[in-house]
Protein backbone atom coordinates (compact mmCIF):
# COMPACT_ATOMS: atom_id res chain seq x y z
CA UNK A 1 0.00 0.00 0.00
CA UNK A 2 2.87 2.40 0.77
CA UNK A 3 4.26 1.85 -2.73
CA UNK A 4 0.86 2.72 -4.23
CA UNK A 5 0.61 5.88 -2.14
CA UNK A 6 4.14 6.93 -3.09
CA UNK A 7 3.37 6.33 -6.77
CA UNK A 8 0.13 8.35 -6.58
CA UNK A 9 1.92 11.17 -4.76
CA UNK A 10 4.62 11.25 -7.45
CA UNK A 11 1.97 11.31 -10.15
CA UNK A 12 0.20 14.13 -8.35
CA UNK A 13 3.40 16.19 -8.00
CA UNK A 14 4.40 15.65 -11.63
CA UNK A 15 0.91 16.38 -12.92
CA UNK A 16 0.54 19.54 -10.84
CA UNK A 17 3.95 20.83 -11.91
CA UNK A 18 3.02 20.18 -15.55
CA UNK A 19 -0.09 22.35 -15.18
CA UNK A 20 2.11 25.26 -14.14
CA UNK A 21 4.75 24.55 -16.78
CA UNK A 22 2.13 24.39 -19.52
CA UNK A 23 0.70 27.72 -18.38
CA UNK A 24 -2.68 26.45 -17.20
CA UNK A 25 -2.06 27.73 -13.65
CA UNK A 26 -0.11 30.51 -11.98
CA UNK A 27 0.93 31.44 -8.44
CA UNK A 28 -2.57 32.59 -7.54
CA UNK A 29 -3.70 28.96 -7.66
CA UNK A 30 -0.95 28.14 -5.16
CA UNK A 31 -2.27 30.88 -2.89
CA UNK A 32 -5.81 29.53 -3.26
CA UNK A 33 -4.61 26.04 -2.27
CA UNK A 34 -3.03 27.50 0.89
CA UNK A 35 -6.48 28.61 2.05
CA UNK A 36 -7.68 25.01 2.14
CA UNK A 37 -7.36 23.22 5.47
CA UNK A 38 -8.80 20.26 7.38
CA UNK A 39 -11.82 22.35 8.33
CA UNK A 40 -12.64 22.99 4.67
CA UNK A 41 -11.10 20.13 2.67
CA UNK A 42 -13.22 20.89 -0.41
CA UNK A 43 -12.59 24.65 -0.41
CA UNK A 44 -10.57 24.78 -3.64
CA UNK A 45 -12.87 22.46 -5.58
CA UNK A 46 -15.90 24.48 -4.41
CA UNK A 47 -14.29 27.78 -5.46
CA UNK A 48 -13.38 26.28 -8.82
CA UNK A 49 -16.90 24.90 -9.30
CA UNK A 50 -18.23 28.44 -8.86
CA UNK A 51 -15.59 29.73 -11.26
CA UNK A 52 -16.56 27.19 -13.93
CA UNK A 53 -20.26 27.98 -13.46
CA UNK A 54 -19.44 31.66 -13.98
CA UNK A 55 -17.40 30.75 -17.08
CA UNK A 56 -20.38 28.99 -18.62
CA UNK A 57 -22.68 31.97 -17.96
CA UNK A 58 -20.20 34.60 -19.13
CA UNK A 59 -19.21 32.69 -22.27
CA UNK A 60 -22.88 32.15 -23.07
CA UNK A 61 -23.61 35.87 -22.56
CA UNK A 62 -20.69 36.86 -24.78
CA UNK A 63 -21.70 34.36 -27.46
CA UNK A 64 -25.26 35.75 -27.50
CA UNK A 65 -23.97 39.31 -27.70
CA UNK A 66 -21.68 38.42 -30.61
CA UNK A 67 -24.26 36.27 -32.42
CA UNK A 68 -26.35 39.12 -33.70
CA UNK A 69 -27.41 40.34 -37.09
CA UNK A 70 -27.51 43.89 -35.78
CA UNK A 71 -24.97 46.00 -34.01
CA UNK A 72 -22.72 44.30 -31.47
CA UNK A 73 -22.62 45.93 -28.04
CA UNK A 74 -18.85 45.74 -27.57
CA UNK A 75 -19.09 47.45 -24.18
CA UNK A 76 -21.38 44.66 -22.93
CA UNK A 77 -19.02 42.00 -24.29
CA UNK A 78 -16.09 43.89 -22.78
CA UNK A 79 -17.78 44.00 -19.38
CA UNK A 80 -18.24 40.21 -19.45
CA UNK A 81 -14.62 39.76 -20.55
CA UNK A 82 -13.49 41.99 -17.69
CA UNK A 83 -15.51 39.92 -15.21
CA UNK A 84 -14.08 36.68 -16.61
CA UNK A 85 -10.56 38.08 -16.46
CA UNK A 86 -11.04 38.97 -12.79
CA UNK A 87 -12.46 35.56 -11.94
CA UNK A 88 -9.74 33.69 -13.80
CA UNK A 89 -7.07 35.83 -12.18
CA UNK A 90 -8.43 35.12 -8.69
CA UNK A 91 -8.26 31.33 -9.15
CA UNK A 92 -4.96 31.26 -11.03
CA UNK A 93 -6.37 30.27 -14.43
CA UNK A 94 -3.43 31.76 -16.31
CA UNK A 95 -4.29 30.85 -19.91
CA UNK A 96 -7.88 32.03 -19.58
CA UNK A 97 -6.73 35.29 -17.97
CA UNK A 98 -4.15 35.88 -20.72
CA UNK A 99 -6.75 35.31 -23.44
CA UNK A 100 -9.07 37.76 -21.71
CA UNK A 101 -6.44 40.49 -22.10
CA UNK A 102 -6.43 39.96 -25.89
CA UNK A 103 -10.22 39.64 -25.91
CA UNK A 104 -10.59 42.97 -24.09
CA UNK A 105 -8.31 44.65 -26.65
CA UNK A 106 -10.50 43.31 -29.46
CA UNK A 107 -13.59 44.68 -27.72
CA UNK A 108 -11.98 48.10 -27.30
CA UNK A 109 -11.01 48.09 -31.00
CA UNK A 110 -14.54 46.89 -31.92
CA UNK A 111 -12.87 44.04 -33.80
CA UNK A 112 -15.74 41.60 -34.34
CA UNK A 113 -13.65 38.82 -35.92
CA UNK A 114 -11.05 39.14 -33.17
CA UNK A 115 -13.75 38.91 -30.51
CA UNK A 116 -15.25 35.78 -32.07
CA UNK A 117 -11.80 34.18 -32.31
CA UNK A 118 -11.00 35.08 -28.68
CA UNK A 119 -14.36 33.75 -27.50
CA UNK A 120 -13.66 30.42 -29.20
CA UNK A 121 -10.19 30.27 -27.63
CA UNK A 122 -11.50 31.16 -24.17
CA UNK A 123 -14.12 28.43 -24.46
CA UNK A 124 -11.48 25.86 -25.46
CA UNK A 125 -9.07 26.90 -22.69
CA UNK A 126 -11.65 26.96 -19.91
CA UNK A 127 -12.83 23.47 -20.89
CA UNK A 128 -9.24 22.19 -21.05
CA UNK A 129 -8.50 23.66 -17.62
CA UNK A 130 -11.64 22.13 -16.16
CA UNK A 131 -10.64 18.69 -17.45
CA UNK A 132 -7.07 19.07 -16.16
CA UNK A 133 -8.22 20.15 -12.71
CA UNK A 134 -10.78 17.34 -12.52
CA UNK A 135 -7.93 14.92 -13.22
CA UNK A 136 -5.84 16.55 -10.49
CA UNK A 137 -8.69 16.33 -7.97
CA UNK A 138 -9.23 12.68 -8.90
CA UNK A 139 -5.57 12.00 -8.10
CA UNK A 140 -6.03 13.76 -4.75
CA UNK A 141 -9.03 11.54 -3.97
CA UNK A 142 -7.10 8.41 -4.90
CA UNK A 143 -4.27 9.39 -2.55
CA UNK A 144 -6.68 10.01 0.32
CA UNK A 145 -8.64 6.81 -0.35
CA UNK A 146 -5.37 4.86 -0.26
CA UNK A 147 -4.67 6.34 3.18
CA UNK A 148 -2.08 8.87 2.06
CA UNK A 149 -1.65 12.60 2.41
CA UNK A 150 -1.86 14.87 -0.62
CA UNK A 151 1.59 16.42 -0.97
CA UNK A 152 2.22 20.14 -1.08
CA UNK A 153 3.78 20.96 -4.42
CA UNK A 154 6.43 23.68 -4.44
CA UNK A 155 6.44 25.29 -7.86
CA UNK A 156 9.17 27.84 -7.26
From Swiss-Prot:
One of its GO terms (cellular component) is cytoplasm. Two-component system major event consists of a His-to-Asp phosphorelay between a sensor histidine kinase (HK) and a response regulator (RR). In plants, the His-to-Asp phosphorelay involves an additional intermediate named Histidine-containing phosphotransfer protein (HPt). This multistep phosphorelay consists of a His-Asp-His-Asp sequential transfer of a phosphate group between first a His and an Asp of the HK protein, followed by the transfer to a conserved His of the HPt protein and finally the transfer to an Asp in the receiver domain of the RR protein. Induction: By salt, cold and drought stress. It is found in: Cytoplasm, Cytosol; Nucleus. Residues 40-147 form the HPt domain. PROSITE patterns: HPT. The modification Phosphohistidine is found at residue 82. GO terms for biological process: antipodal cell differentiation; cytokinin-activated signaling pathway; embryo sac egg cell differentiation; phosphorelay signal transduction system. It comes from the Eukaryota. Keywords: Acetylation, Cytokinin signaling pathway, Cytoplasm, Nucleus, Phosphoprotein, Stress response, Two-component regulatory system. Strongly expressed in flowers and roots. Detected also in leaves, siliques and stems. The modification N-acetylmethionine is found at residue 1. Its main location: cytoplasm. GO terms for molecular function: histidine phosphotransfer kinase activity; protein histidine kinase binding. Disulfide bonds: none annotated. Histidine-containing phosphotransfer domain (HPt) contains an active histidine that mediates the phosphotransfer. Functions as a two-component phosphorelay mediators between cytokinin sensor histidine kinases and response regulator (B-type ARRs). Plays an important role in propagating cytokinin signal transduction through the multistep His-to-Asp phosphorelay. Interacts with the B-type response regulators ARR1, ARR2 and ARR10. Binds to AHK1, AHK2, AHK3, AHK4, AHK5, ETR1 and CKI1. This is Histidine-containing phosphotransfer protein 2. The gene is AHP2.
Amino acid sequence: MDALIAQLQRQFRDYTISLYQQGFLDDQFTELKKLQDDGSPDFVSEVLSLFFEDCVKLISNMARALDTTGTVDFSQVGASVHQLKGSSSSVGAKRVKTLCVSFKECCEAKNYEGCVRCLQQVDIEYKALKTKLQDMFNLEKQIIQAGGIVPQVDIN
